[in-house]
Amino acid sequence: MTLIHMNIFMAFTMSLTGFLMYRSHLMSALLCLEGMILSLFILVTLTVLNLHLTLAKMMPIILLVFAACEAAIGLALLVKISNTYGTDYVQNLNLLQC
């Protein structure tokens, strides 16, 4: 395992730890999820480039598309919860009736 891969794995682990510890606010959870997705994107891109996989060159782009969709849906939920309840607590997601 190279130093770059270890740093990316540590970034993913720190984001996962932050997601598990600070999950009471939706904004914190979304930021940690974005950190996880970005570290996965960099790891997949480096793996595809290092192994010269021609069939898997679309995988990082597909991962970015899913990350953009996740961010858009998360921000839409954040705006809806903030407008409805005035806070961004994750516990309000159970009360949201769309």
Swiss-Prot record:
Its EC number is 7.1.1.2. GO terms for cellular component: mitochondrial inner membrane; respiratory chain complex I. Keywords: Electron transport, Membrane, Mitochondrion, Mitochondrion inner membrane, NAD, Respiratory chain, Translocase, Transmembrane, Transmembrane helix, Transport, Ubiquinone. It is a multi-pass membrane protein. It catalyses: a ubiquinone + NADH + 5 H(+)(in) = a ubiquinol + NAD(+) + 4 H(+)(out). GO terms for biological process: ATP synthesis coupled electron transport. The chain crosses the membrane at residues 1-21, 29-49, 59-79. Belongs to the complex I subunit 4L family. PANTHER family: NADH-UBIQUINONE OXIDOREDUCTASE CHAIN 4L (PTHR11434:SF0), NADH-UBIQUINONE OXIDOREDUCTASE SUBUNIT ND4L (PTHR11434). Core subunit of the mitochondrial membrane respiratory chain NADH dehydrogenase (Complex I) which catalyzes electron transfer from NADH through the respiratory chain, using ubiquinone as an electron acceptor. Part of the enzyme membrane arm which is embedded in the lipid bilayer and involved in proton translocation. This is NADH-ubiquinone oxidoreductase chain 4L.
